[in-house]
Amino acid sequence: KNWRLFIELIHARTHKLIDHQSIDFNPDNPLSVLLSQVINILIEKIPNINFKSINTQQMPSLDSAVMYMNGRMEMYRYTPESLKRALVIFRDCVSTQPQNTLPYCCLAECHISLALLGLSEQKQAITTAVTSIEKALEINPSNSQALGLLGLISGLKDEHSVSNVLFKQAHLLKPNSPDVYYYQSLLCFLNGDLARAFNLIEKSIALEPNKMGISILKLIILYYTSPLDNAISFALNLNSQNTCNNPIITSILAMFMALKGHNDKAKSLLLKLEPEHGLDYTCVNSLYTKFLIYGASIKNDIMKLLANINTNKINGVILPLIYTVYGKKEYEKRWQQLIKDNDLWSNVLLHDPRLLSVKNEFNTIGVMRTSA
């Protein structure tokens, strides 16, 4: 029979109640499973919490829980490198804690995040994520995070009825879960339902302001839906909150500055980024910014980089760069291929302000066809 533990998180100085939650725990499971759940609450509710890894053979359960916490914090930072580190940590977690659902869910989220950013092959990442989610649900069929992740992936596969049921069930099991709101917002964004995506991400960020992936999704939605100054203001706020440079935010902010004509500020931000060796989300933003600053003089360099990469294997984040360098014809060819491949970005690309002229042209064609 499960134990139900009631936990209250109270500020030591003010004695103010920060949060209270209940946790169901099977006493037959290792203590590390319970500790991971407690640590989950601490990470979500205490800004900038930081624990060092514990080197002790006397407390293996605590050591496993701290390993999970370190992975969770790397995932929260949401940089290309931190997500890769988190992936390695969570793989270790599921091998040492195979009965714990939390690392499986985080492992799945890392795979999806890396695929979204163009840092891993999408189909393989989604397949691996599904395997992790199914394992989590095998252990605990009522895990709201796993159900939310499965709702996200089902929606990405156009299984919308299944997706809606899974999200509804996840919300019922854990009302006001920042993770479930985040997954649902991400699905709405990728499907082009930007208004609903924004409402959901606002709910998520209000509950979990420390998870950078949530904030970055809000930033991208703002860029797609609001005046550029609004997105810049939010990006500057995020940048000031980060003691460590986040290359994703930096690359977006550099692009914003170049779009506004603030080339010196854009150049200063570009200096904080690593040289482009691939075509992930950060590198594409960096190259696009350089094109805005330097124009035709850098076009050949970008084309050489594109020529050295198999563009049939990359995802939709590169399309604005292809449109800028090669023009509409090549863009349309790549976009149609991405639609056939069910690329994660294929449905939302026309909302990208960098592709506004293409969107307007397609809308005009649609109006003409309707009139005919």
Each predicted region: which residue ranges?
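Short, charge-rich amphipathic alpha-helical segments embedded
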Residues: 91-121, 340-348
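Short coil/turn linking the two alpha-helices of tandem helical-hairpin repeats
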Residues: 71-80, 108, 112-120, 157-158, ...
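Structural signature of tandem alpha-helical TPR/SEL1-like repeats
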Residues: 82-88, 117-135, 156-169, 190-203, ...
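Catalytic-center loop of serine/cysteine hydrolases
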Residues: 1-76, 81-82
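Alpha-helical protein-protein interaction modules
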Residues: 198-372
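Residue-level recognition of tetratricopeptide repeat
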Residues: 72, 109, 116, 152, ...
